[in-house]
């Protein structure tokens, strides 16, 4: 459920004038995306932050947070603010599922929109997560945008964009070889300040920006 596949849905919400939140799932409903009442797309990073904020700060639940390598650093910041232990794992929900089965986990989720929460099954469930967010909206009496602002008040605003590129196998191999050799030290005018290579490569351009 990514934005480029949901243009018609976003437009329906935007023109309706009486929809507070839109919920989008993939075919087997294990992934989630949301839209606010103005038809603005809410990505998985914001949803993860909302769930952590609601379950811990509002409901008073505790537990470890697990997230994938490609998730926003804002999760690290929110967990630090709330005193929650954070595990960052390789990409793929199987790495989170193992933690959720063996440990006390509040929220486990990754950038692709697969999220699991405490009190439910240790597996992705997009519909359930949507219901939890709707519960948050109903009990608080606030809009989705207002709830996101609550999170921003703690960790600051941020933006995320994902672009999936179709490239030739030869170019892919060349890029991987360059990454392995450490050949990328800047992207355009942005200098790389550090590199994480837990699963692929994450090039940090500042403490809060990465490629």
Which residue ranges define each predicted feature?
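Short, acidic/small-residue loops that bind anionic groups at enzyme active sites
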Residues: 41-62, 90-92
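Short, ordered loop/turn segments at secondary-structure junctions
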Residues: 27, 37-38, 47, 70, ...
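N-terminal small/polar loop signature for handling phosphorylated ligands or for N-terminal nucleophile
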Residues: 1-35
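Short glycine/threonine-rich catalytic loop with a Thr-x-Gly-x-Asp
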Residues: 26-27, 41-46, 121-125
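Short Gly/Thr/Asp-enriched flexible loops that form oxyanion-binding sites at enzyme active sites
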Residues: 30-50, 75-76
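Phosphate-binding and adjacent anionic-ligand microenvironments
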Residues: 21, 58-211
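Well-ordered alpha-helical segments embedded in enzymatic catalytic cores
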Residues: 5-12, 47, 51, 95
């Amino acid at each position: 459920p990514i934005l480029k596949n949901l243009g018609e849905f976003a437009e329906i919400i935007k023109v309706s004038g009486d929809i507070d939140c839109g919920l989008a799932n993939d075919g087997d409903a294990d992934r989630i995306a949301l839209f606010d009442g103005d038809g603005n797309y809410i990505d998985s990073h914001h949803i993860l932050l909302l769930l952590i904020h609601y379950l811990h700060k509002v409901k008073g639940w505790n537990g470890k947070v697990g997230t994938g390598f490609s998730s926003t650093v804002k999760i690290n910041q929110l967990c630090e603010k709330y005193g929650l232990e954070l595990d960052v794992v390789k990409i793929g929900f199987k790495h989170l599922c193992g933690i959720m089965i063996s440990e006390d986990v509040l929220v486990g989720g990754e950038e692709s929109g697969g999220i699991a929460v405490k009190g439910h099954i240790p597996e992705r469930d997009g519909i359930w997560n949507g219901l939890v967010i709707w519960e948050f909206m109903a009990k608080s009496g606030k809009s989705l945008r207002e709830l996101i602002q609550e999170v921003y008040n703690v960790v600051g605003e941020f933006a995320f964009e994902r672009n999936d590129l179709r490239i030739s196998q030869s170019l892919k191999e060349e890029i991987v070889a360059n990454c392995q050799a450490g050949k990328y030290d800047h992207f355009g005018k942005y200098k790389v300040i550090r590199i994480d290579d837990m699963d692929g490569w994450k090039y940090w351009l500042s403490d809060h920006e990465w490629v």
